[in-house]
Amino acid sequence: MGSHSIGSEEGAVVAAETQSLYERLGGVYAIAVVVDDFIDRIMVDPRLNANPRVDEAHHRVSAQGFKYYVTEQVCWAAGGPQTYSGRTMLDAHRELLITGAEWGAFIDDFHQTLAKFGVPERERAELDAIIESTKDDIVTPAAPAV
């Protein structure tokens, strides 16, 4: 017989099921490490920087400040105690004219970062849903063909 009873295993399962995404990701420090890698990755991605507006923004905005706001936003969206204090996604991205292909590159970078840190599938799916909820405010709709 092992050192754990069935009751304690059931308790562990129940605790894991009731924890917020924020808690399951390890809290602000773990989230900040992942965001740090992700922002470093997107700041130099040639697929994103091919858009001159994005490239200019990447050179105008402090990477450290960008990392702060993204960390704050992820923590807030994942159920942490933080409150996002940055601009709306629409206001922050409206002038960048981000295309669907650039969104795809951004998502690819995001998935590479999650894989690097071994983020489990359940948490990846929840993070994907959070990111996907911002797409309509970030991607500029294509102009209709004339």
How would you label these PLM feature ranges?
Residues 2-146:
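Core of compact, soluble alpha-helical bundle domains
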